[in-house]
Amino acid sequence: YKIICLSNYFGKESGILAGLDNSEGEAIIIMDPDLEDPPELIKDLIKKWKEGYDVVYATRKKVQLPFYKSILKKIFYLVFKIFTKQGFNIPSNTGDYRIIDKKIKNILISMRERIRFLRGLISYIGFKQTGILFDRPIRKKGKSKTSISWLIRYGMDSLLSSTGAPVSVITRIGLFS
């Protein structure tokens, strides 16, 4: 394994990209560093990948979110689906925890957008994908540091990096008002 130390916090997506840039294996596991998603699931992800899937994502059976986060999540995915129309099929209750094949990694690192939404890009790229269900354990320590403002900013960045439709709509409204 390899440890990559960044000089500063550049965001989750940039951290994942740094890991992808420096990975050398035939498959790469992507997971959040807080270990809320159980590392024990890695063997199941690898098993499915060995069955011939290019992407195997981990899907939470049940998601326990505060009410406001649940509402924001539903709004984001509804708006995302409306604006992106075809090409994106992001499974519900699926975060970044997954295994991707080397060919997926190579495509992702060739896409050098400054702002990226990896879940969306991986969905958009296609190839053979499947998910495995798991129970996410209740957080043992601490609280999520994810604020409402961060969620909204991340949602807007994700949407704008995936489609130009919102900019087009805003431009048209501006021209005709």
List where the protein language model places each region.
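Acidic donor-binding segment of Leloir-type glycosyltransferases
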Residues: 1-4
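Acceptor/aglycone-binding surface of glycosyltransferases and processive sugar-polymer synthases
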Residues: 6-8, 12-22, 39-118, 137-156
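Short aromatic/hydrophobic "clamp" motif used to bind/position activated sugar donors
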Residues: 28
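The conserved acidic donor/metal-binding loop of glycosyltransferases
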Residues: 32-36
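Histidine/lysine/aspartate-rich catalytic loop segments that bind and position anionic ligands
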Residues: 127-129, 135-138
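Alpha-helical bilayer-embedded segments of polytopic membrane proteins, i.e.
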Residues: 156-177
